[in-house]
Amino acid sequence: RGLGDVYKRQFNECGLAMAGLNFVGNAAYYDIEEGKDNIAQFEFIPWILGTCANLEEAKTALIHMNLTNTPYSEQFPLAQLHWIIADQSGAITVEAMEDGMHIYENNVGVLTNNPPFNIQMFLLNQYMNLSPKQPENLFAKDIDLDQYSRGMGAIGLPGDLSSSSRFAKVAFTKLHSVSGDSENESVNQFFHILGSVDQQRGCCDVNGKYEITLYTSCCNTQKGIYYYTTYENHQITAVDLYREELDGTKLFRYPLITGEQIRWQN
């Protein structure tokens, strides 16, 4: 087995999708438990998407599941992750922690990293006054205050690169974003939404190494199309699931298209 056998973002032909995101310091997995469906952490995504057709089936499967601490190999330790599972009906967040498995309804439909999801949701209380509309003067009616700029209704929306700030910003952006009706408009708008929390090289320095957004991806779960961009290539690349043999056993691999694709006009 190679690292290519490990999946972090996936969807199936029924329209169910799942992604694992870093949850370092909070993730915990368990010893094998008799009477449970014991699933290794690295098998979690293919197990859910290989056995469940929709979110309700996934919720039922989770009742009987025990996420085990079986390592992928001696060379690769357990990845510390939490997960979002979604279909057209909604989304849930799954977090395995020292105090047990937590499953949350995810009404905002986004996930970043730490802190745990329930705390992320609590922190949104701090931003309940934010709006995409221009604000009215509630500071003092006797003081003439000027709306000197557009976008003042969202003053206070975080702009730093911490995971809790990115959670708040991408939730606000997603929940207020307006897309057109076409496939291309929806895909375009999706990349703009996630672009609001991109990490640029040099802005997050961790011991001389820089956090960057390596790639961004989305799926049309009804048509089976996977779209992605990379840090080096902003052109959207698409892979069509239904152009491959779904009932076969061969694993199809597509190398990332990197290097900026620039369209010259003269």
Please provide the spans of the model-predicted regions.
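A short, structured loop/turn motif at beta-sheet edges
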Residues: 12-14, 49-57, 180-187, 221-223
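Short, small-residue-biased leader/transition segments that mark boundaries at the very start
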Residues: 2-7
